[in-house]
């Protein structure tokens, strides 16, 4: 294994854990949030560092490698990380399950979009 493969694996794991009950499209949208954080300079503008810090804060389980949604995430991840696709989150820096958005949160931040069961905010 080479360093870039390990890095991509950690990025994929962070995206999967963030939206494991969602489709791969939601997982890829989460990847876009990590990309937006990177562009904003979080953790010295390092995508890998953004993802592993998130994984450390939110430890959890691991995907079933036979899961078709996880396989689609792996297949399409590089199109997001290389900047080949448009940001469907409109610059969001955070994501949250839509059913957890309260009035205090919605008054402090703006929801940029909702994809699947997640709302994307900035």
Where are the predicted features?
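Bacterial extracytoplasmic/cell-wall-associated proteins, especially those involved in peptidoglycan
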Residues: 2-122
């Amino acid at each position: 294994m080479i360093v870039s493969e390990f890095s991509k694996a950690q990025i994929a794991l962070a995206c999967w854990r963030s939206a494991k009950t969602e489709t791969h499209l939601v997982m890829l949208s989460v990847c876009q949030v990590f990309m937006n954080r990177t562009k904003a300079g979080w953790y010295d503008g390092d995508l890998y560092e953004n993802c592993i810090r998130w994984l450390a804060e939110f430890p959890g389980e691991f995907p079933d490698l036979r899961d078709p949604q996880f396989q689609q995430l792996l297949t399409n991840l590089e199109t997001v990380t290389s900047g080949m696709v448009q940001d469907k989150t409109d610059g969001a820096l955070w994501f949250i399950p839509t059913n957890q958005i309260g009035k205090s949160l919605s008054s402090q931040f703006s929801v940029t979009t909702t994809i699947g069961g997640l709302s994307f905010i900035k």
